[in-house]
Amino acid sequence: MSEQEALKCSSARNRGGTQRVEGKLRASVEKGDYYEAHQMYRTLFFRYISQAKHTDARELMYNGAQLFFSYNQLNSAADLSMLVLESLEKSEAKVEDEDLEHLAKLFSLMDPNSPERVAFVSRALKWSTGGSGKLGAPKLHQLLAVTLWKEQNYSESRYHFLHSSDGEGCAQMLVEYSAQRGFRSEVDMFVAQAVLQFLCLKNKNSASVVFSTYTQKHPSIEKDPPFVQPLLNFIWFLLLAVDGGKLTVFTVLCEQYQPSLKRDPMYNEYLDRIGQLFFGVPPKQSSSYGGLLGNLLNSLMGSGEDEEGEEAQEHGSPIELD
């Protein structure tokens, strides 16, 4: 027998052994021997880990967690879910979409109000930074956002959409959020905040997609500009200005639409950061003019009218995105 054939036989035996073990554990759960089954899962997990069988350990815990969830054994299920994460951490496994989908599935099965869920998602996002994204893998954020949207936890869903790359999904959630929880007079503010925050995260593409999708799908908004709401016209012009990178255009926009921008005190904070990122505005400093406009006017007088976005400051004080 060749070495390759021997490896195949060994792998088949391992799968067969794992399946037999899972069958026995499932039978214990079905009989109601939850505590005994839970302890057996834990024993097998640490045995597999000590043998560096990380994939086997992870698959066993993932299937076991789902089984316990199906029998409403939430504490045991949450514990095995944490062991799934532990196996990923100890194996230093590469971040794969399948693993992210499994983590999101376990998250969706947990009690939304449980402290275990909070601990699980925090740890999962931290592990996922091994792939892409300082605040967690965008794919995981997107999956979490969809689950929270289904639970009508719109504010938490919006946070995770912001750290994903799914502008379209974010817009559709915001349309529902606006319809379910907002006033008719605030339909423009839901999308304005999202666009400004996406731009603060240097995600121009998602900012554009969320705006176009939201305005197309919201029943209380015209499908195309110009819009009745001045704030929507400002956001539309801002997205065009970001592509052009002209400081003069940005300054005039902020000046002309000040009445609309005063509706939320955070807008000028976001715009100050956007000015730094895309229009070469230096970080906020004390000014005789005061505020955002003063900073913009100082920038114009100090750098000329043809300041380009490519020379924008990459570093500045971060803005807390809720």
Curated annotation (Swiss-Prot):
Q: Does the keyword Transmembrane apply?
A: no
Where are the residues of the annotated region Disordered? 303-322
Q: Name one GO biological process term.
A: tail-anchored membrane protein insertion into ER membrane
Q: Where in the cell is it found?
A: Cytoplasm, Cytosol
Q: Where are the transmembrane segments?
A: none
- What domain of life does the native source organism fall in? Eukaryota
Q: A GO CC term?
A: cytosol
What's in the keyword line of the UniProt record? Answer: Cytoplasm, Transport
- A Pfam family found in this protein is GET4
Q: What does this protein do?
A: As part of a cytosolic protein quality control complex, the bag6/bat3 complex, maintains misfolded and hydrophobic patches-containing proteins in a soluble state and participates in their proper delivery to the endoplasmic reticulum or alternatively can promote their sorting to the proteasome where they undergo degradation. The bag6/bat3 complex is involved in the post-translational delivery of tail-anchored/type II transmembrane proteins to the endoplasmic reticulum membrane.
Task: Give the family from UniProt.
Answer: Belongs to the GET4 family.
The protein's assembly and partners? Component of the bag6/bat3 complex.
PANTHER family, A to Z: GOLGI TO ER TRAFFIC PROTEIN 4 HOMOLOG
The protein's name is Golgi to ER traffic protein 4 homolog
Q: Which organism is it from?
A: Salmo salar
